[in-house]
Amino acid sequence: MKNGNAGVDEGRRAALKTMGAGAIGASIGADLFGTPSASAATAAPGASARAATPGAYNILFILTDQERYFRPGELPAGYRLPAHESLAQRGTVFVNHQINSCVCTPSRSVLYTDRHIQHTKMFDNTNFPWISSMSTELPTVGDMLRDAGYYTAYKGKWHLTKEFETVNDLGTPTKIFTKEMEAYGFSDYFGVGDIIAHDQGGYLHDGIISAMGVNWLRGRGMTLATQGKPWFLAVNLVNPHDIMFIDTDRPGEPVQSRNILGHIRPEPADPLYARQWPFDLPA
């Protein structure tokens, strides 16, 4: 067992075991852009009531980067996200999460350890010299679910280990860091350096991340199913993070692009980005 507050860790493990038996993987029929349905609202407090369900649910956890929650009426008229809606109807939606930090590394450290940043020590992004890698002594969701009997796997963006983003060049990767991710409680990681996503990072890499997730489900996931072993797969996408690096300057007006630390680009020349949705941005 990794170091930490034993009482707190045991409480987290007990909660995760209960959730694994029902709450996380159950289909609760929630509306992604509103409150859960009546059946979901009554089912949510009843995780203990579902704990007696035989077997454990497989858990597919999909994490996007920098995607805000839209309340009813905030999206433009006619705008729909059918894939989001399908996931909401078939899976579990968390509508009461409060963001702990608007910076990537601190926020991800809390999501994957259930501890605040004063405990994870991840106060800023790992690509800054004053931040070290997250300690492998800190139990993660992967560690806790492994204790509960799950096979745990991870795909995509991590941004919690310094070495992941400094050793490899994206064009000529030499190390995939599978062994290093085992120390954080996750198997089957395959990275070409950490995909921390600067300009067009999501556009370039999310297809690869999604494909790795699908490949895992068709391969390892099916094998585990025949063995009767429950699994947890975390698929970590980059977008809509690309918006941080969009160049909105008009031709001949280098206003935004002056005196900045990173690279920015206009939107890709892709039909996906061609459609316009004219509506007022939040103040």
Identify the residue ranges that each predicted region occupies.
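Active-site-proximal N-terminal segment of extracellular/periplasmic enzymes that hydrolyze or transfer
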Residues: 46-95, 101
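Loop/turn elements at helix/coil->beta-strand transitions in domains of secreted/extracellular proteins
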Residues: 55-58, 92-95, 148-151, 228-231, ...
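N-terminal export signals
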Residues: 3-8, 14-37, 41
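Active-site-proximal cap/lid insertion segments
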Residues: 51-57, 66-78, 223-229, 237-283
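A short beta-strand-to-alpha-helix junction
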Residues: 54-55, 77-81, 98-103, 128-138, ...
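Catalytic-site neighborhoods of secreted/periplasmic enzymes
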Residues: 110-231, 243-262
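Short, solvent-exposed turn/loop segments enriched in Gly/Ser/Thr/Pro and often Arg
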Residues: 74-79, 91-113, 154-165, 236-241
